[in-house]
Amino acid sequence: MKRMNILLVMLLWVASQMQAQLVQENETAIVYYMPKTELVITLSYDCVEQIPGVFYQYAQRYLGAKNIVTEKKTTYRLNDMTLCTKASADTDRAYKVNAQKGYNTQLLSLTTDGRLAGYNIGYEVKGDKVKGEKQEAKAEKQEELMPLLEEQFMAGSVAKMAEGAAKQIYRIRETRLNILGGDVEHVPADGKAMQLVLDELDQQEQALVALFVGTTMVTHHKHTFSYLPADDVEKEVVCRLSKYTGIVDKNDLSGEPIYLTLKAHKQSLQTAYMVDPKATIPSQLYYNLPGTADISLQHQALSISQSITVAQYGVSIPLALDLFKSKQEYSIYMHPETGNILSIKQ
């Protein structure tokens, strides 16, 4: 037990010394960083815009309609929430490899932001895709002319125009029934031609009915933002959804809260000792033994839960110096997202 405690202290001291070191003037060294994990939260929501028809006051009288839009309004509703992760360099966990101490620094492979990707692997540097903070689908609306005939426009009053539009709707429905029943003078030549005629009649009817019951247009939107996991949190408000303005700031009480709960499972130096109890002579190359976290998001009745790997919850463990002093060449593959070892090959 005493030996184990001494080794744990040594590991902690070595890690702290490596992080404290800076590249001195005229010193040949490469600095690399452990990764840190960010949550990328995407909220999918709809904007529902309702516009009343010009004849909405006559919808019940002429069409017997009940679900009628009587006023113009816009509302928002949340459909889905998703979680994923992205990695970046953790500048608080920096290490260096000194060329004067027998390391071939040219064999080090780093990502564009300085995370360690491997040693002697010929890593191809690829830039991470940058995601926008907010992405929204846009819908363009065009003014449409009312689908009325000349005689309806000349009716002289809104009530007469509504009556004429209703009669036109019933004529369209009657024509459709006659075509389907074969009770027309000129029957469409084939099934495809008949379907084209029926589709045209449907469009005419929908346009006329909308003058009475109104229209509802739904546009789909996405809001994406990042969250950096730290300590445990219980129902932290990360943002809000307002029924009338959409996604708003977490301090805007006009919206209903979207909660995030996080339970961290951090690694310890005791775990590091269990990984390598022989405590071989450490090198200047460290890998990360990451931790995990249980994440949940909740908004009213909608909720999701997920377990993720979190790099900053891990501990740094030195690779054995023997790997670099051996006559055999080793290739060490690292996971740039977590800092952990993927594989070691001769």
Residue ranges and their predicted role:
Residues 21-346:
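N-terminal amphipathic/basic membrane-interacting segments and domains
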